[in-house]
């Protein structure tokens, strides 16, 4: 039987962040990933903020950045555009479009450089509680092994099993799981190629369509919907949008990505004896945008740091590990809760109301733009928004 201090299950950005920081803290760490290649297939639109990377101490690298973003375009159902570009306003949440296949791999490499052992093509198939830890059953290329860990960090995504194996609730109920589908496309025709575009309304019930540029004529074009608000599968909404949108009507798909996005917020408990949960598995996702790379890596960082402290102290109990829950909520919960309320408000809006807001935004003088500033502007132009969101500004 293999023994380790910390076993991280899931090699996405959150898991690699957890493994890296646990190893930096002096713990013996193993990181498992079921895929044969970390980072593939990608399952997101690949956007991150510069501020978020800086907070995590990650230096931007041309190896995994495909485009620097200097603006945002918001489009309502009737085609009214709200342009928010760096030429006119400050963009504190400006960022990059990544190449996730490369980024994720480099984050795993950082974990390895910190001292973590990485095992690819290794699936966790079960987990049994023992007196002070877990025994995790694994399967890799026809070979079965058991790993005994003092602390398990579950970073196995929104459909993961590890937290539930430990008796914890998952990150999202079915109705709070967005269905996402995306093409990487070529021959996309941009009005401005360094601007990310969002389209709202019945084109994507309960969510939105995005166009994220990755090159001169290359973009991620996708959408996320709440299936209980929809009348057909997500892929049909996306294909309909692509056929009608001037930017994409002549484009060709070279890659298809699908996945679920938990937008219900963090569960009540992300820890127990000998276990921590982070990333999408812990609902560490912005409910409004569905973005979870930076927040998931932040949760992973805290999980790794607290796990390493617990190993040093020889205390792997839920009483000690609760520290992770507190630190993470202190950092992330205000933003997640706020954007959950905005998302719930957006779900109440008809196409006509979205158009009216876009028309009203034409007269708003933005000095800087972030998601928070957009919420403030929304409250100014919509009395309905003031009632629901006023306390968050």
From Swiss-Prot:
The annotated pathway is: Membrane lipid metabolism; glycerophospholipid metabolism
Kindly list the GO molecular function terms attached to this UniProt entry.
flavin adenine dinucleotide binding; geranylgeranyl reductase activity; oxidoreductase activity, acting on the CH-CH group of donors, NAD or NADP as acceptor
Which metal ions or organic cofactors does this protein require, according to UniProt? FAD
**Class of the enzyme per the UniProt entry, highest EC level:** oxidoreductase
All disulfide bonds of the chain are: none
- Cofactor binding note of this UniProt entry: Binds 1 FAD per subunit.
- Which keywords has UniProt assigned to this entry? FAD, Flavoprotein, Lipid biosynthesis, Lipid metabolism, Oxidoreductase, Phospholipid biosynthesis, Phospholipid metabolism
Pfam families this protein is in? FAD_oxidored (PF12831), GGR_cat (PF22578)
Binding residues annotated for FAD, in chain numbering: 14, 33, 44-45, 47, 100, 124, 280, 292-293
Question: What EC number(s) does its UniProt record assign?
Answer: 1.3.-.-
| GO terms classed as biological process | glycerophospholipid biosynthetic process; membrane lipid biosynthetic process
Give the InterPro entries listed for this entry.
Answer: DGGGPL_reductase, FAD/NAD-bd_sf, Geranylgeranyl_Rdtase_fam, Geranylgeranyl_reductase, GGR_cat
Q: Which GO cellular component terms are attached? A: membrane
Q: What else is known?
A: Reduction reaction proceeds via syn addition of hydrogen for double bonds.
Q: Extract the PANTHER family matched here.
A: DIGERANYLGERANYLGLYCEROPHOSPHOLIPID REDUCTASE, GERANYLGERANYL DIPHOSPHATE REDUCTASE
**Which HAMAP family would you find in this protein's record?**
DGGGPL_reductase
What is the protein's name according to its record? Digeranylgeranylglycerophospholipid reductase
Species whose genome carries this gene: Methanobrevibacter smithii (strain ATCC 35061 / DSM 861 / OCM 144 / PS)
């Amino acid at each position: 039987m293999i023994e380790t201090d910390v076993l991280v299950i899931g090699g996405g950005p959150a898991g690699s962040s957890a493994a890296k920081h646990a190893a930096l803290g002096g713990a013996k760490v193993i990181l498992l990933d079921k895929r044969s290649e970390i980072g593939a297939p990608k399952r997101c639109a690949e956007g991150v903020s510069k501020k978020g990377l800086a907070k995590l101490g990650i230096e931007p690298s041309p190896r995994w950045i495909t485009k620097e973003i200097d603006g945002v375009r918001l489009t309502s159902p009737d085609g009214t555009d709200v342009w928010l570009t760096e030429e006119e306003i400050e963009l504190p949440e400006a960022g990059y479009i990544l190449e996730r296949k490369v980024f994720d791999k480099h984050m795993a490499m950082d974990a390895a450089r910190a001292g973590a052992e990485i095992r690819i093509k290794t699936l966790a198939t079960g987990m049994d509680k023992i007196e002070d830890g877990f025994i995790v059953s694994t399967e890799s290329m026809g070979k079965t092994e058991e790993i005994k860990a003092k602390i398990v960090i579950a970073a196995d995504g929104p459909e993961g099993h590890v937290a539930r194996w430990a008796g914890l609730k998952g990150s999202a109920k079915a109705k709070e799981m967005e269905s996402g589908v995306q093409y990487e496309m070529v021959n996309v025709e941009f009005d401005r190629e360094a601007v990310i575009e969002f389209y709202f309304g019945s084109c994507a019930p309960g969510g939105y369509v995005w166009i994220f540029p990755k090159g001169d004529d290359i973009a991620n074009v996708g959408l996320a919907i709440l299936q209980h608000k929809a009348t057909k599968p997500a892929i049909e909404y996306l294909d309909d949008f692509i056929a009608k949108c001037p930017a994409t009507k002549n484009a060709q798909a070279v890659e298809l990505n699908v996945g679920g996005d938990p937008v219900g917020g963090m569960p009540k408990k992300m820890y127990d004896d000998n276990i921590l949960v982070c990333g999408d598995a812990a609902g560490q996702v912005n409910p409004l945008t569905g973005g979870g790379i930076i927040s998931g890596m932040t949760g992973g960082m805290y999980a790794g740091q607290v796990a390493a402290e617990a190993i040093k102290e020889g205390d792997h109990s839920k009483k000690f590990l609760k520290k992770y829950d507190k630190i993470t909520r202190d950092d992330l919960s205000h933003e997640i809760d706020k954007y959950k309320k905005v998302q719930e408000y957006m779900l109440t809006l008809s196409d006509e109301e979205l158009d009216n807001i876009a028309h009203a935004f034409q007269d708003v003088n933005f000095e800087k733009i972030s998601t928070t500033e957009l919420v403030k502007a929304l409250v100014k132009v919509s009395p309905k928004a003031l009632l629901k969101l006023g306390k968050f500004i």
